């Protein structure tokens, strides 16, 4: 079993299951590290035997010797895994959910740091001194720990959605979209938003918007 460099304290051995949002028992997109090909901003292509996506900030992790390291996202264009490709969008790596014509929907899953800190602050077993370290995210500094030891930890995660519109990436948010869409496309978007089952976190809803603003 590969060791994942993750936590500097075991004070987080409590569950996030009670939170009414998506949670994950792991801090990586995949349960195990796997081969990947990284396409760099300088034109180079690197084959990485053991790689993963770190949910703290949706960045690339790779194993080098006995260490797990985090790549500089700015140096990447995309990362190809066997069944999923991640593209650099802003400061995160996001995978393609689906396409609609020439446009597409992308998603990056990251830790919900606000909910994470609040749950830490509400835990009566953690002292004020511990809270300062945990809330500052020092617990996510690297120290070797076996993934199997993390079964009882559940981390809150949130999806960040992006549209690729006319070869430009836009963070999916009503305000952002209204800035880039013309009056007619804004009207079409609002018609979808008024549907009873619409949600900004529902991929079917977001793809429906992408369809009507073509």
Language model regions located:
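Bacterial Sec-dependent N-terminal signal peptides
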Residues: 1-25, 209
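Aromatic-patch recognition
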Residues: 51-172
């Amino acid at each position: 079993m590969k060791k994942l460099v993750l936590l500097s304290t075991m004070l987080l051995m409590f569950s996030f299951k009670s939170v009414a949002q998506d949670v994950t028992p792991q801090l990586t997109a995949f349960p195990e590290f796997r081969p990947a090909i990284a396409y760099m901003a300088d034109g180079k292509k690197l084959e990485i035997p053991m790689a993963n996506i770190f949910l703290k900030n949706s960045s690339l992790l790779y194993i080098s010797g006995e260490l797990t390291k985090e790549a500089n996202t700015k140096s990447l264009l995309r990362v190809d895994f066997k069944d999923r490709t991640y593209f650099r969008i802003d400061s995160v790596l996001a995978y393609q959910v689906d396409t609609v014509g020439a446009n597409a929907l992308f998603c990056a899953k990251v830790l919900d740091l606000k909910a994470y800190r609040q749950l830490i602050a509400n835990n009566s077993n953690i002292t004020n001194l511990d809270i300062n370290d945990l809330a500052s995210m020092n617990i996510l500094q690297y120290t070797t720990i076996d993934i199997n030891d993390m079964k009882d930890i559940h981390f809150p995660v949130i999806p960040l959605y992006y549209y690729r519109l006319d070869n430009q990436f836009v963070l999916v948010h009503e305000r952002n979209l209204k800035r880039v869409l013309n009056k007619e496309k804004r009207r079409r978007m609002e018609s979808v938003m008024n549907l009873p089952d619409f949600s900004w976190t529902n991929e079917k809803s977001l793809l429906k918007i992408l369809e009507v603003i073509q």
